[in-house]
Amino acid sequence: MKQSSPEPLRPRRTGGRGGARRAAALVTIPLLPMTLLGASPALADASGARLTELREDIDAILEDPALEGAVSGVVVVDTATGEELYSRDGGEQLLPASNMKLFTAAAALEVLGADHSFGTEVAAESAPGRRGEVQDLYLVGRGDPTLSAEDLDAMAAEVAASGVRTVRGDLYADDTWFDSERLVDDWWPEDEPYAYSAQISALTVAHGERFDTGVTEVSVTPAAEGEPADVDLGAAEGYAELDNRAVTGAAGSANTLVIDRPVGTNTIAVTGSLPADAAPVTALRTVDEPAALAGHLFEEALESNGVTVKGDVGLGGVPADWQDAEVLADHTSAELSEILVPFMKFSNNGHAEMLVKSIGQETAGAGTWDAGLVGVEEALSGLGVDTAGLVLNDGSGLSRGNLVTADTVVDLLGQAGSAPWAQTWSASLPVAGESDPFVGGTLANRMRGTAAEGVVEAKTGTMSGVSALSGYVPGPEGELAFSIVNNGHSGPAPLAVQDAIAVRLAEYAGHQAPEGARMMRGPVQGSGELECSWVQAC
């Protein structure tokens, strides 16, 4: 059957490496090494006064009170020569938070390839009979992290166009491409309601243009004072249960609304009070068994396209004895090169874990975390990364069982910079201060008005007590790779400390700050305990 052509995830915005704009979705372009700039004397002269001043400045920044009691691994390298320009605790094993996604993305490009795409099929045992009937129907997922409700509707239309009018038996959601382990063993149970801790499945429906997997958008609207608030479960309407105890408070009263999914349930619980004059409140919340939600949505799509399902909707794999199953519809995702943009720009945990399990399928025929993480480490070793200081427990960095060193992160950055997929890798990284979220990502609101704006390309990482920023500073005087990994701070994440270092590196690489925006000496303030994209703050 002819496969549908994938649509670009976003229009492309052009710009060279280190320019003011970064591609949001890729087209065919020449792949250029990231180390084309030779080392200028200003960068290469390790005995120069400029380098001494740089080291002193970074030392001063790291004295900030925000880092009291913390351990910080900081390494800066000239990518052209491999020369280490700065190092503090570079060999210390630390939690990486979402900097783990750098390793996952590199392994996915190495194992799957930048042109890899993910398929979803609709299968029956045979073609429809004269009455347009088939017995059972299977919606088969193979790890597409961007499958949307619109894609399901398009496949339902294909099923109808194939002549199917009635499914006499059941509709099954087949997610057996991956195993049935939904969550990493040490992820915190209290995180389960939130989009950054969604269940992982080979068949999941992505929400919105950022492709959040395994979630639904819950909307709460005030009614008349004293009346229950109105709750819309979005895509999960009719699939998840609703426990609505939220009330409408007086105009101007406090908003105490809480939207939860209690652990082990498929119930959205809404409590608290929403003022009568408040705007509607929306929040992404996870669902139990994302594949079952996909099946529910596909049944609705079939009904909308004139196909009736007589039986139930459930989970199940295509029978092994269906040697010549009839594929009635299919969908092919965009290529990995494009999928990496929402994955890395918005630090999407669901994408990371689906990629790990896809790597496991590719390397070992097993869509499991165990197989996938072995595949990730082997790919990194094959790339030339020294993995001795690396401990992998998931692909996203949400696990507190992961360990990296700043040395290893910078090693990865250097090896990735000379890989055939270097341009694809670069295009996926957030760019400092760029207001377009598909360019700036989690750095969209950071380092604006500084020498780093539109220049620094780096992956963020933040969760309680852990924060990191690692990436590149290209410039007219050469290119730097850097990693900053902070662990053990007791207050908010020291984002401004990281930003001050990145700005100083941009200045060192030859960029000029706008008038009045030079780096300020002395204390800087941090903020946030989670990635800004996880809480819809960027």
Swiss-Prot record:
Superkingdom field: Bacteria
Propeptide: 516-538
Family matches, as InterPro entries: Beta-lactam/transpept-like, Peptidase_S13
Statement: the UniProt record of this protein carries the keyword Transit peptide: no
A GO molecular-function descriptor: serine-type D-Ala-D-Ala carboxypeptidase activity
Pathway(s) it belongs to: Cell wall biogenesis; peptidoglycan biosynthesis
Major place of residence: secreted
Annotated region (Disordered), positions in chain: 1-21
UniProt activity-regulation remark: Inhibited by benzylpenicillin, cephaloridine, ampicillin and cetiofur.
Keywords: Antibiotic resistance, Carboxypeptidase, Cell shape, Cell wall biogenesis/degradation, Hydrolase, Peptidoglycan synthesis, Protease, Secreted, Signal
Residues covered by region (Absent in class-A beta-lactamases): 146-319
Subcellular location: Secreted
Family per record: Belongs to the peptidase S13 family.
Role of this protein: Removes C-terminal D-alanyl residues from sugar-peptide cell wall precursors.
Protein name, UniProt field: D-alanyl-D-alanine carboxypeptidase
Organism: Actinomadura sp. (strain R39)
